[in-house]
Amino acid sequence: EAVETIIGNVNVKQPVIYKEEKQDKIELILPKKSSNSERAKTYLMSRGIAPEIIKECMDNKLIYESLPNHNVVFIGLDDSKSPKYAFYRGTNQTRFMGEAKGSDKKYTFRLEAKTECSRLHLFESAIDLLSYATLLKLKKIDWHKENMISLAGVYQPSKMVESNKIPIAIQEFLKKNPNINEIYLHLDKCKLCNAKSFRKKL
């Protein structure tokens, strides 16, 4: 269905664009979990994420701290709540980050609405997503009522916008949620004209 509204922040950017290649499925290999998540919590709080949101994500097994490097790991779950995707990010100043081997991009890190919702918010990273949830909380808006998906890093789109492909995470979500009629792009450094092409493809 056509998307009625596409809104970004000050700038709007087309989401992750990549050409999916058929390949044998590899089982997801999750980083070893630390028994203590204090470094991960401290890092996320230093990024301005609300402690309550961090705790809820950790309680729901969406975020944990890994060993031996104490990275923050963001988990994407399938419909049966099984881990299918993992993105790790260093808790120091090195900006170390990457995807765990076997990650399925259909299930990137997300927070789904707990009630009926026709809106979908797209973010470049899990940190951006959590920051937005925190802003909603600060405004006393219930972030549990919004669908939010991280695109796990934005790939450089083709110069020929019409040839770009919608990220599989969005395709899958829209397939399972046909009621979505508004998509909000919270992405960086983009030309507004690209949003028009993106809208047509949905």
Stretches with model-predicted labels:
Residues 158-160, 192-197:
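Short active-site-adjacent structural elements
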Residues 173, 194-202:
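Short, aromatic/basic amphipathic alpha-helical patches
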Residues 122, 181-193:
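Acidic beta-strand-to-loop metal/phosphate-binding motif
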